[in-house]
């Protein structure tokens, strides 16, 4: 199924900072699951395994693996990822910053904390897109939650370690 991004999607993304695009990458889910399985079996040296007394299962985070995991590379270069990003940003070109993989076991009890992606990155700018593609169903209590308009707040949300809630930066006053 090929889904075309429409003007309403673009307007929602630009006004709200978020848009749900159901089914856009549905034909890629099986490929991405194979890549995720490969990633879990052989995490990179950048991988983080989060531990917390409330976590009941594995919580693995890994990134920048698209060169090592062929399924990720295939998705990045052969799906509509770039054209979808380009449409949403109203841009003639896009650049890949990185891939980011989160693996939470089904009953891990690991909620996704409130956050914005930009404070974690070593880049700045307004024309950025992050795609969240769930490969399996999860309980709502541990799923990603989005706050429309948060990209227009006066301060960014303080970036923290997801396991310890410790700030990434010393200057916490710069953040909410």
What are these regions (language model features)?
Residues 1-16, 20-114, 120-122, 159:
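Non-heme Fe(II)-dependent double-stranded beta-helix
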Residues 23-24, 106, 135-139, 150-151:
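Short loop segments at secondary-structure junctions
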Residues 38, 130, 163:
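Glycine-rich, phosphate-binding/catalytic loops in enzymes
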Residues 82, 117, 128-132:
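Hydrophobic, well-ordered secondary-structure segments
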Residues 100, 116, 133-137, 146-148:
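Short, structured patches in soluble enzyme cores that scaffold and shape functional sites
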Residues 122-139:
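Short, conserved beta-strand element in jelly-roll/cupin
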Residues 139-176:
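Double-stranded beta-helix
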């Amino acid at each position: 199924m090929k889904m075309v991004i429409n003007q309403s999607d673009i307007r929602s993304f630009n006004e709200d900072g978020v848009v749900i695009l159901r089914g856009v990458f549905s034909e890629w889910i099986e490929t991405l699951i194979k890549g995720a399985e490969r990633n879990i079996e052989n995490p990179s040296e950048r991988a983080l395994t989060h531990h917390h007394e409330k976590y009941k299962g594995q919580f693995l985070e890994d990134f920048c693996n698209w060169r090592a995991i062929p399924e990720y590379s295939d998705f990045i270069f052969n799906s509509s990822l770039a054209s979808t990003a380009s449409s949403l940003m109203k841009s003639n070109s896009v650049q890949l910053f990185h891939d980011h993989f989160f693996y939470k076991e089904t009953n891990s009890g690991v909620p996704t904390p409130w956050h914005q992606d930009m404070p974690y990155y070593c880049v700045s700018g307004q024309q950025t897109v992050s795609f969240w593609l769930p490969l399996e169903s999860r309980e709502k209590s541990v799923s990603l939650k989005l706050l429309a308009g948060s990209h227009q707040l006066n301060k960014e949300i303080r970036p923290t370690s997801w396991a310890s809630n410790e700030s990434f930066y010393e200057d916490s006053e710069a953040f909410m």
